[in-house]
Amino acid sequence: MLNRRQVLSLIGAAAAAGMLSPAAAEILRSRELPSSEVAALFTQFGRTHRMPEALGRWLKDPAQQVIPPYQVFDNVWYVGLRWVAAYAVKTEDGVILIDTTHEPFAQHFIRNLETVGIDLKDIRWVLMTHGHFDHVGGAARLKPLAPNARFVMSRRGWEEAFHDARGEQGFAMLDQPDVTLKDGETVSAGSTVVTLLETPGHTWGTSSYLYNVKDGSKTRRAVTVGGLGLNAISGPEQLDAYIASMKRLASRELAVEVDLTAHPFSIGMTEMIPDIEKHIPGGPHPLADRPAFCRRLQALARGAQARKKELFG
């Protein structure tokens, strides 16, 4: 039986070469999972803190995780993996990225950027939602290739990232924090302004990013919510923070219409790709659905309330 380091080595070699060795293929033999099943397996993982075998194989399988990039809106491209998102927002003055995926797939993320015509020297901002490896784990590979980019997170997000990077299941991380934003602060490139919202709950350092997307003659308000899972809960106060964050994200004040999720399986986004690609600019868009977004947030808040009662009485 190979250990975790050997497994990751096999995966990395396979991802770099674009093929699987026989040993890696045997270890990673998995099947395609629909979003609903992935979500159910992650719920199971959050409750038991034990990775379901089928989910673990699916997450590590290049044949499942490596997907081509696609255009989501006139100014937004999906450049991430099947299970974890990364977005490229093109502006008149460079590119804004949201999240960086993780190793051993970060080279695929970078290849996706190049595929959609992005010169890495044109990246202005790399906005990271929180410190978990799947969101910041590609930053170390990207940084030397994107010399003009600034890397952004909240203070607690940076703290979590460096704590996790030094842990037993550690990962390569930047040498030090770059740009630290507080709740409500913004970055901009061209006419695009992105606001950081501190939305603790998934972790204490989780942030979400609020920005406009272009859809033909329409401008729609979008958000990338940093995290929705309850797999890292430390106490009832964190669940209270989670519930408050869900309510804030659903508020009329923010007026979010588009959920550009950090994890596609949470909204069935992978299954929407054909409709997204067929979308006529300015027409109905599969992701432009404020009522559905608010219903999801309300359901998540109810789930967190139930989890609080179950765990803490």
Q: What would you call each of these model-derived segments?
A:
Residues L81, T101-F105, G131-D134, G201, ...:
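Extracytoplasmic/periplasmic, Sec-exported soluble proteins
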Residues I98-D99, R124-G131, V152-S154, T199-P200, ...:
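Active-site neighborhood of phospho(di)ester-bond hydrolases with catalytic His/Asp-centered motifs
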Residues L28-L33, V76, V95, P104-Q107, ...:
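Active-site HxH/HxHxD metal-binding segment of metal-dependent hydrolases
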Residues Q6-E26:
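N-terminal export signals
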Residues F105, G131-G137, W158-A161, W204-S207, ...:
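Active-site environment of divalent metal-dependent phosphoester hydrolases
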Residues R57, Q65-V66, Q71-V72, P144-L145, ...:
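Metallo-beta-lactamase
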Residues L2, A14, E26-P62, G216, ...:
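Accessory terminal helices/loops
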Residues P62-V116, S208-G229:
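Conserved beta-strand hairpin/beta-sheet module of binuclear metal-dependent hydrolase folds
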